[in-house]
Swiss-Prot record:
The keyword Lyase applies. It comes from the Bacteria. PANTHER family: SIROHEME DECARBOXYLASE NIRL SUBUNIT, TRANSCRIPTIONAL REGULATOR, ASNC FAMILY. It is an enzyme of class 4 (lyase). This is Siroheme decarboxylase NirG subunit. Belongs to the Ahb/Nir family. InterPro entries: AsnC_trans_reg2, HTH-Siroheme_Decarb, NirdL-like_HTH, Tscrpt_reg_AsnC-like, Tscrpt_reg_HTH_AsnC-type_CS, WH-like_DNA-bd_sf. Disruption phenotype: Insertional mutagenesis results in the loss of respiratory nitrite reductase activity in vivo and in vitro. Mutant strains synthesize a periplasmic cytochrome cd1 that lacks heme d1. Involved in heme d1 biosynthesis. Catalyzes the decarboxylation of siroheme into didecarboxysiroheme. Keywords: Lyase. The lineage of its organism: Bacteria, Pseudomonadati, Pseudomonadota, Gammaproteobacteria, Pseudomonadales. The gene is nirG. It comes from Stutzerimonas stutzeri. Pfam families: AsnC_trans_reg2, NirdL-like_HTH. Pathway: Porphyrin-containing compound metabolism.
Amino acid sequence: MDELDRQLINRLQHGLPLVRHPWEALAEELGSTAEVLRLRVQALLDDGTLTRFGPMFDIDRLGGAFTLAALSVPEARFDAVAAQLEAMPEVAHNYRREHQWNMWFVLGCETPQGITETIARIEAQTGLTVLNLPKEETFHVGLHFPV
C-alpha cells in the first residue's frame, strides 16, 4: 500500500463527492486520475485490504427491515452453514466470532415479516436456533479508521 492508497482509503471513508462526476472530482483532489483511482479501489478489494466498497443506505427511510442475528454452529458444520447463509440474498454479512454464538450475520428484507420468514427458513434449513437482535435505537458515531 502506497501513499495514494492511504489517501484514497482515508478520503473514501467520508464518502464520494456529491457531484455529477465524483471520481473526477476525487481524482483532482488527490492529484490522480479517475481511472487510476477506480483501479486502485478494485486492487484493494482484490487483495483483501478492503472487504467492501459501496453505498450505505438508511433502510428505515427506504421502508425495509434489517436485524443482526447469530447462530451457535457446531465447528464441524460451520463451513456448510456459512455456505447456506451466503446463498441467501437476504444475508448481507456473515462473520465468525470466538463465542458461543460463533456465526453473526445481518439480514435485510423488504418488510419486518420478511425478517421473520427468513429466520424461520434459516432455522428449518440448518436445524439451529437463530438469535435475533433487532435494532432498538440508531446511533451515528462518525466512525473513521485513519490509515
